[in-house]
Each structure stands twice: as C-alpha cells, then as structure tokens.
C-alpha cells in the first residue's frame, strides 16, 4: 500500500497582481508536487495558479469545490487523492486557507483521519492589518462580519467595545467592499471618542492605506473608503 499524501494549505494573493511580491518561491516549488486541489471557486483558482506560471498545463490539474455550503459527508470523496498517495492542496479565495475561510472544515477532517497538515507561508490580511495597526497584538479576536442592519451593528459595536475595554483586547472585523463606508460610519459614530480605530484597505495592493487614530480624530475627517477589501480594528 502506498504512503498516503499530505494536505497542504496554500495562501493566495489578497490584492490583484501581487503574486511576485507575496507568494514565496518555496510555495511555488511545493505547488509542483500538487495536482489535486480543494477550492472555493474553480475559475478563480485556475486563474491564480495560471498567474504563477509554474505549470505546463492547468488543464491537467484536478479541482473539487469546497465552500461554505459543503457538507462533512462530502469530504471522504474529496480526500481520495491523499489515500492514493497523492498530495492535496487547499486554495483560499483570498489569503490563508482555514482563517475566515471554509477550508477549516477539510483541515479538521484531516486531523480526525490522521492526515498530515502542512501550512505554507503567505499573506493574511487579518494578521498584516493587526501587525500594522499598533493595537494589542497579544490579545485579539476576529469577529468576521458585523450585522448589516445599522441599529444591530451599532449595538454589536457597543458590546464589543465593552469587551475590548475589560479584556484589553483588539477587536477585528471585515466587510464586503461596497459596505466599507457604512461600517466605518457606524464605528466612528458608535465608539467612544478615546477608542483607537484602525482601518486597513487594500493591504499589499497598489492602493494600500493603513491608518490608526482615536475615534475623536476620525470624526474630524471626511472618511470615504474605496470599494476594496478592508480590515477594521479597534481597541478601547
């Protein structure tokens, strides 16, 4: 019986046309040993791998969809290549698999079935934003998306600010790019004037902007964010 393969977690770019700067050569080399992939969207995964210019033919690669709608019962079939002794890679739509990403489901399955998990180096917008924020990097929490409804969003912001103050904990959020300004407005409106707020937009991209000010300083500014991926962080 052949030795089983490994599950590789493969980061992708978090801003367009940044492959050369953020995807290490070690990842490109490792990718050459992987022909089977679990991806959120086959089209974007193929486009990303094509941009790295390491495969002679993308058509020879095998892709299976793993997204937020995937069920645990589907994983056994997805992991067939590993049982056959071949490596399997998880590609995130943006950044690191398993971090704010459905890849965590497959990673959990791998551990439960004694399959070696190998994380590869690459960009994470959440960690890069935290690094550049100047806020507490020893104690922090990522909350994903806040409620869309403004009233519910403001209520959640108040509760999380209270938690931040009690625990000295940085609170981290993301938002759909077209709602960036709505969330920024709610944060500036709902947070205490002395609370520190960082807004990081298009990290690693050509329009990268990472600014941190007390909320009272943000109130003096005209905040108009582009419709690009953004991370929001605050510390009370």
Predicted feature residues:
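Glycine-rich, flexible N-terminal cofactor/catalytic loop recognition
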Residues: 1-66
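A contiguous loop/helix-start segment that scaffolds small-molecule binding in enzyme catalytic cores
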Residues: 2-8, 86-87, 166-236
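Class I SAM-dependent methyltransferase SAM-binding "motif I" and its flanking Rossmann-like core
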Residues: 105-163
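Alpha-helix capping/helix-boundary segments
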Residues: 43-45, 95-96, 125, 179
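Short active-site oxyanion
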Residues: 31-37, 114-118, 170-171
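Conserved helicase motor
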Residues: 64-71, 146-150
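Short glycine-rich anion-binding loops that position phosphate/pyrophosphate groups of nucleotides
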Residues: 14-16, 93-97, 177-178, 205
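Glycine/small-residue-rich loop that forms an oxyanion/phosphate-binding "nest" at active or ligand-binding sites
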Residues: 67, 75-117
């Amino acid at each position: 019986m052949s030795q089983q393969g490994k599950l590789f977690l493969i980061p992708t770019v978090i801003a367009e046309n940044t492959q050369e700067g953020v995807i290490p050569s070690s990842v490109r080399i490792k990718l050459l040993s992987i022909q089977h992939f679990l991806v959120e969207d086959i089209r974007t995964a193929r486009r990303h791998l094509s941009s790295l210019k390491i495969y002679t033919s993308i058509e020879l690669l095998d892709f299976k969809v793993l997204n937020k709608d995937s069920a645990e019962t589907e994983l056994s079939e997805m992991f067939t290549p590993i049982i056959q002794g071949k490596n399997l890679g998880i590609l995130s739509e943006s950044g690191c698999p398993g971090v704010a990403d459905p890849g965590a489901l497959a990673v959990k399955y791998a551990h439960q079935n004694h399959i070696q998990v190998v994380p590869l180096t690459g960009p994470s917008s959440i960690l890069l934003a935290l690094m550049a924020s100047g806020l507490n990097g020893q104690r922090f929490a990522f909350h994903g998306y806040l409620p869309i409804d403004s009233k519910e969003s403001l209520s959640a912001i108040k509760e999380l600010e209270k938690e931040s103050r009690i625990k000295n904990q940085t609170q981290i959020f993301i938002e759909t790019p077209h709602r960036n300004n709505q969330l920024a407005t709610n944060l500036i409106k709902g947070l205490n004037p002395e609370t520190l707020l960082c807004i990081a937009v298009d990290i690693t991209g050509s329009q990268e902007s990472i600014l941190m000010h007390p909320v009272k300083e943000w109130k003096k500014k005209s905040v108009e964010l582009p419709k690009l991926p953004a991370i929001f962080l605050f510390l009370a």
